[in-house]
Curated annotation (Swiss-Prot):
Catalysis performed (reactions): glycocholate + H2O = cholate + glycine; glycodeoxycholate + H2O = deoxycholate + glycine; chenodeoxycholate + glycine = glycochenodeoxycholate + H2O; cholate + taurine = taurocholate + H2O
Provenance organism: Lactiplantibacillus plantarum (strain ATCC BAA-793 / NCIMB 8826 / WCFS1)
Keyword annotations of the record: Hydrolase, Lipid metabolism, Transferase
Residues that hold deoxycholate according to the record: C2, R16
Pathways involved: Lipid metabolism; bile acid biosynthesis
Alphabetized InterPro entries for the sequence: CBAH, CBAH/NAAA_C, Ntn_hydrolases_N, Peptidase_C59
Protein name (record): Bile salt hydrolase/transferase
EC number: 2.3.1.-, 3.5.1.24, 3.5.1.-
Superkingdom field: Bacteria
Any GO BP: bile acid biosynthetic process
Length: 324
């Protein structure tokens, strides 16, 4: 389970909550322009856009969960169990394995428009990363400074949806999630008028009553509605620090605390990390479950014309500022 959003404020932002019950020693990884991106069924990319994002610590390969390239194009993969359907190899199509999709797109495209133009023949082929790491059932939110789309590979084939709300969670299909927002059109960020009946004098006894009916549970459909409502009504200071802070507050409205979502006996899903990409400045911000301090890694502070991956383990231990 996860939630990803876009946000326009002082700059343009993209990020996600990564919710799971197991950590794979996540780290911020920069893939420089000359690091060879090797693919199973298509030509390798020996020179490409630089990429920054969160990866799993496996076999010195940039196995990205979410990432941004130097042009500001961003992608996040989110769980889509029971719906994702990967295909057999098709010689007439562009065969990319799901774990290759993020580096393949970010390595060569600079905008959502370019992505849409070049994935019409995309075939997400069913090839595992390794015997120990089978494919995860995913769908993807892709965004730039102007627009966002959702990519889903389902039984009926490849689906590409324009995403007018800039939000993605998990099941069911994105088009159904978007339609479901119609059920919440009466929600408001202001105090509602009494439309129950003119014959009954009803009191607005509390602030926030315009949000009555806003889902508060952790299911994917509820998180989609809550994240969309929070994001689309959110205000932030027109500064970098104010915008980034507000971005994490938006994600905080749908974060998961340990103990609330039992997956198996004694194992609970929780928000392992939250991220925020500044598309304009190339900065990757994050915080973790135990460390609420916002940390940052800048793509442009590194030498990007090299051939080796650059990695920074997540700062997961709590950080405190002693006032006295």
């Amino acid at each position: 389970m996860c939630t990803a959003i876009t946000y326009q404020s002082y700059n343009n932002y993209f990020g996600r909550n990564f919710d799971y019950e197991i950590s794979y020693n996540e780290m911020v990884t920069i893939t420089p322009r000359k690091y060879p991106l090797v693919f199973r069924k298509v030509e390798n990319l020996d020179h490409h856009y630089a990429i920054i994002g969160i990866t799993a610590d496996v076999e010195s390969y940039p196995l990205y969960y979410d990432a941004m390239n130097e042009k500001g194009l961003c992608i996040a993969g989110l769980n889509f169990a029971g719906y994702a359907d990967y295909k057999k190899y098709d010689a007439d199509k562009v065969n990319i394995t799901p774990f290759e999709l993020i580096p393949w797109l970010l390595g060569q495209f600079s905008s959502v428009r370019e992505v849409k133009k070049n994935i019409q023949k995309l075939n997400l082929v069913n090839i595992n990363f390794s015997e120990q790491l089978p494919l995860s059932p995913l769908h993807w939110l892709v965004a730039d400074k102007q627009e966002s789309i959702v990519i889903e590979s389902v039984k009926e084939g490849l689906k590409i949806y324009d995403n007018p709300v800039g939000v993605l969670t998990n099941n069911p299909n994105f088009d159904y999630q978007l339609f479901n927002l119609n059920n919440y059109r009466a929600l408001s960020n202001s105090t509602p008028q009494n439309s129950f009946s003119e014959k009954v004098d009803l009191d607005s006894y509390s602030r926030g009553m315009g949000g009555l009916g806003l889902p508060g549970d952790l299911s994917s459909m509820s998180r989609f509605v809550r994240a969309a409502f929070t994001k689309l009504n959110s205000l932030s200071m027109q500064t970098e620090s104010g915008s980034v802070s507000q971005f994490f507050h938006i994600l905080g409205s749908v974060e998961q605390q340990k103990g609330l979502c039992e997956v198996t006996d004694g194992k609970y899903e929780y928000t392992i990390y939250s991220s925020c990409c500044d598309m304009d400045k190339g900065v990757y911000y994050y915080r973790t479950y135990d460390n609420s301090q916002i940390n940052s890694v800048s793509l442009n502070h590194e030498h990007l014309d090299t051939t080796e991956l650059i990695s920074y383990p997540l700062r997961s231990e709590a950080q405190y500022y002693a006032v006295n």
